[in-house]
């Protein structure tokens, strides 16, 4: 490898590390053109590290599933466990998004559909479990390209270390819905 190629690779590696640090350094995501403010890049970084992932969103769109699919698959290959709870609130979830997830990830992901017809279902949260702590993203982003990137969506991340009481409330609410108010897809 020529010296110029080595220098270019180092520059690209340093640039990637700088961008990753910028992305990871915020707990507030508001969407827009600045990728540091886009939830997508935060989720990708979290997926790369998590031992398990719990996602609860009111709807899934094929555009968003396509964006996350490779990293979800990589996490599963690493041994991470992934659970997804979604719904058909307002009839927005695209069947093609569900088929795509099932086709690519199969039974390796525990995917469920919220199953109460008399109660609205509109949560948007991504819970990442690591060794020793957990992160939760809560906000307005469902899984669609716009919601994960340039759309104006407000999301906030906090950890089980910084706010254990509220983290536990959200996590237990997820567990209750997932185990007792859903059907397996």
Kindly label every feature range from the protein language model.
Residues 1-185:
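PLD/PLD-like phosphodiesterase catalytic module centered on the HKD motif
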């Amino acid at each position: 490898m020529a010296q110029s190629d080595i220098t270019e690779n180092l520059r690209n590696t340093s640039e990637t590390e700088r961008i990753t640090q910028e992305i990871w350094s915020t707990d507030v995501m508001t969407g827009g053109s600045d990728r540091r403010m886009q939830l997508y890049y935060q989720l990708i970084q979290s997926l790369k590290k998590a031992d398990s992932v719990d996602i609860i969103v009111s709807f899934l769109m094929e555009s968003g599933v396509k964006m996350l699919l490779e990293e979800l698959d990589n996490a599963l290959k690493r041994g991470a466990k992934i659970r997804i709870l979604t719904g058909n609130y307002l009839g927005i979830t695209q069947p093609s998004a569900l088929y795509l997830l099932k086709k690519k990830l199969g039974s390796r992901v525990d995917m469920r559909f919220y199953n109460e017809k008399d109660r609205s279902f509109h949560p948007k949260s991504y819970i990442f479990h690591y060794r020793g702590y957990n992160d939760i993203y809560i906000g307005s982003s469902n899984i669609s390209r716009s919601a994960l990137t340039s759309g104006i969506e407000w999301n906030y991340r906090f950890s089980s270390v910084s706010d254990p009481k509220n983290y536990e409330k959200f996590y237990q609410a997820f567990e209750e819905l997932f185990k007792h108010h859903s059907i397996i897809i």
